[in-house]
């Protein structure tokens, strides 16, 4: 299956056929929820927290105006005023576009789609900014810089770097172009060093045999018991009240 546009890339068929960083992370969080998403039985709702990042992404892609035309409700309240989410996204955009270094790292080929084989299965990736022979940069809009490590972006960097190398572009360094949603936007370029990327790829390799077997229907997925999907399909059980008192 070829993936030449967003419709194909994000299709249910593509998610069944390919692995991606987001799908791998889904399996790490909850195998049952990840399996349900692949089967089309569960769809994780988009949150307001994700919207600001999406708007900034679309500006760098050059498709923000298209989104405004297609979904005006994202931008405007019923009274015609700009929504707070878009106002914040607009602040971030105006701030980072005045910074030469930030814009240079985001000046590569936008949303480049890669397809390759790794660990015996097909993978897909879409790069925010690809500078051939120079670097891979991923745009991140986060609450603050401390939250960057929480989201484990080294996993994303490891997969993207491996994909770029497998597609014949060589091994390139991986950077995060990060901006915050704080009252006064903070922004910087973070390089994830090679030893960290190597460890992340080794971790993925160790987990993939089980995840591949689950996706293929050869093993049963584990239910984490705490995510929204697990709560949506659970059955009541008798529990000890003292569980709630544990620190």
Specify the residue positions occupied by each region the protein language model found.
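Metal-dependent nuclease catalytic regions and adjoining charged, substrate-binding loops involved
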Residues: 3-5, 86, 149, 162-247
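Short secondary-structure junctions and interdomain/linker hinges
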Residues: 62-66, 100-103, 153, 211-221
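Broad hydrophobic/π-residue packing in well-ordered secondary structure
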Residues: 34, 57, 139, 153, ...
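Generic recognition of cysteine residues
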Residues: 28-30, 77, 131, 135, ...
């Amino acid at each position: 299956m070829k993936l030449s546009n967003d419709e194909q890339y994000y299709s249910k068929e593509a998610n069944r056929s390919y692995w991606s960083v987001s799908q791998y992370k889904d399996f790490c969080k909850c195998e049952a929820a990840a399996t349900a998403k692949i089967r089309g039985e569960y769809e994780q709702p988009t949150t307001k927290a994700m919207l600001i990042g999406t708007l900034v992404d679309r500006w760098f892609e050059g498709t923000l105006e298209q989104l405004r035309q297609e979904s005006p409700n994202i931008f405007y309240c019923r009274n015609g005023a700009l929504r707070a989410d878009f106002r914040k996204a607009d602040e971030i955009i105006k701030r980072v576009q005045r910074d030469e270094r930030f814009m240079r790292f985001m000046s590569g080929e936008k949303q480049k789609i890669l397809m390759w084989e790794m660990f015996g299965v097909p993978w897909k990736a879409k790069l925010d900014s690809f500078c051939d022979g120079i670097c891979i940069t991923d745009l991140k809009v986060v609450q603050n810089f401390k939250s960057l490590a929480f989201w484990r972006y080294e996993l994303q960097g490891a997969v993207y770097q491996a994909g770029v190398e497998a597609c014949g572009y060589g091994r390139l360094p991986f950077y995060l172009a990060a901006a915050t949603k704080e009252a006064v936007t903070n922004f910087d370029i973070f390089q994830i060093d090679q030893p960290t990327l190597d460890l992340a790829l080794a971790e993925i390799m160790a987990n993939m045999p089980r995840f591949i077997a689950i996706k293929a229907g050869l093993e049963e997925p584990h239910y984490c018991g705490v995510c929204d999907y697990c709560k949506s399909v659970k059955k009541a059980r008798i529990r000890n009240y003292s569980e709630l008192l544990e620190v």
